[in-house]
Amino acid sequence: VTRPNRLVNVRAEIQGRIEHLPGEKGRRVKAGDELCVLAVDSRHADLTQSQALFNKAFLEYKGVLDLSKQRLQSEINIAQAKAELETARANVKRAELALAKTRIVAPFDGVVDKQPVEVGDVLSPGTVCVSLMETNPILITGQIAEKNISAVKPGDRVRGKLVHGPEVTGTISFIGSAPEMQTRTYPVEVTTPNPKNLIRSGLSIEMFVPMAQTRAHLISSASLVLNDAGDVGVRVVDNA
């Protein structure tokens, strides 16, 4: 069965009201494209205020350093001015980050699978904006019998035939370490390119895994015989 290489719920990191939803369900997006845009509200003003306080703290710290050269400031005053400057710098970074987080963007190229919110909804930190699905490459998941598990390894090339579609090729990217207890088969994943996104998630597919070659002889069934114990043998003629 085919499934996405990644399926991620993209969540809000701050609280805010949705103003725009460019990441519509079914849309293909690139990494960095906007999925949800939250209202800026007072965040621009917060950034402007924090930048002004930083500039003030910087000038005060510079003034304290100038006076210290004339031995008119104590070490305590210098340390306090520096601490206030670093606090102001951190507040600027915090305000910039809060403003940037109003834009919820795609972490990778993919397809918007679900969009459980609407314009006007208020998101809290952790609320899902969209579910994003990566389908290039796409994964093919299946099972390998216990008797064949030693014949395959990660990196082996595999062919696959879609029930209603073309043949595809891929590479084994994962083999489970433990079998399914009921079937005694091991889970396996095959990664296959899907640049045109022609292979959808959830499709049934038949996989062909090449095994190691073994030399053998083809013997006609007419040459096979059973002994009195029921064992299969081959009747041969010794011309010596």
Q: What do the predicted segments below correspond to?
A:
Residues 3-6, 22, 39, 116, ...:
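A generic structural motif
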Residues 36, 142, 217-218, 235:
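Residues that recognize and position ribonucleotide moieties
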Residues 37, 143, 189-191:
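Short hydrophobic/aromatic beta-strand micro-patches
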Residues 1-15, 173, 222:
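N-terminal beta-strand block that forms a small beta-sandwich/beta-barrel module immediately after a flexible targeting
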Residues 45-58, 144-150, 172-180, 219-228:
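Short, compositionally biased
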Residues 1, 17-22, 28-34, 98, ...:
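Surface-exposed patches in structured soluble domains
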Residues 113-114, 138, 162, 166-233:
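Structural microfeature recognizing short secondary-structure transition sites
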